[in-house]
Structures are given as C-alpha cells and as structure tokens.
Amino acid sequence: MKNNLTEKGIKTINKWAEKYGIKELKINDEKVLNLKQLCIFDTNIKHIPAAIFKITNLKSLSIYCNNLKQLPKEMHNLIKLKRFNIDCPNSENFPDGIAKLINLETIYIRNCNGKLNLQYLIGGIVKLNNLKSLYLDIE
C-alpha cells in the first residue's frame, strides 16, 4: 500500500511537535514513511494530528497522555497496525473504524476512564479476527 504522508502532513506533524517541545518527533525526510513503531509518552497534548495516521507502515502505536481527549478518525488508515496501546485517562472516545484495523493482534487499553462508549468499542473489537490479546482496564 502506498504511504499517504504528504509534505504538508510532515510540516503539520513538525509544527505540532515543535509546539509541544517534542524533538524526537521531528520529521525531516522520507524515512518516516517506513516508521514501524511510534510511542507518544508523557506529553501534555490534547489531540494528535491526523497526519500521523497517514504513516501506513506503522505496526505498533503506544500513546500515554493524560490530557488527550480523542484520537483522529483517520486512525483506521493504520491497516498494518498489529499492536495498539493506549493509556489516556481523559480520552472521551475512540474513532469509528477500529474494526478496519484487521491486522491488530494486541490491544491494551488502560485508564481510559473518560466518556468511552464501551459497547461501541467492543462491537468493533469483536470483528478483529487476528486479535490474540486484549487488555481492558476501564472503570
């Protein structure tokens, strides 16, 4: 599958990273197109730019952010994603299309105690035929 991350998307990610003082996320060349793992830890971000979800070769995504409210709807573009970890106490919802992440093998959801629609989330998860491990710690 062709990667859809454009120069404009790279600039958006760079501006976002600069705004939050995240130097490790700087994107200067096309090496990011082959990025396999992305970890976003201990930041004060409230949203993640949709451009990150155009890195279609991503296989592992880990997000640990206290202030994150929601993930972009473009998350369903990560069709090669095998592992998804999220620990975001203030997240309010997951985007539509988690069932489109057909290669997911592991889902780890912890401390997402916001206004999650658990019924909707589970409805998408049960459609994931490759899922081998599911960890939910939701109050």
Show the residue positions of the predicted features.
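Generic detector of contiguous secondary-structure segments
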Residues: 1, 88-99
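LRR N-terminal entry segment and analogous cap-like coil->beta motifs
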Residues: 2-65
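Low-complexity intrinsically disordered segments
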Residues: 3, 9, 40, 53, ...
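The feature encodes a structural signal of leucine-rich repeats
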Residues: 25-26, 48-51, 71-74, 94-97, ...
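Leucine-rich repeat
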Residues: 32-33, 54-58, 65, 77-81, ...
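A short, hydrophobic secondary-structure junction motif
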Residues: 38-39, 48, 125-133
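Concave beta-strand-loop units of leucine-rich repeat
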Residues: 39-44, 62-68, 85-91, 108-120, ...
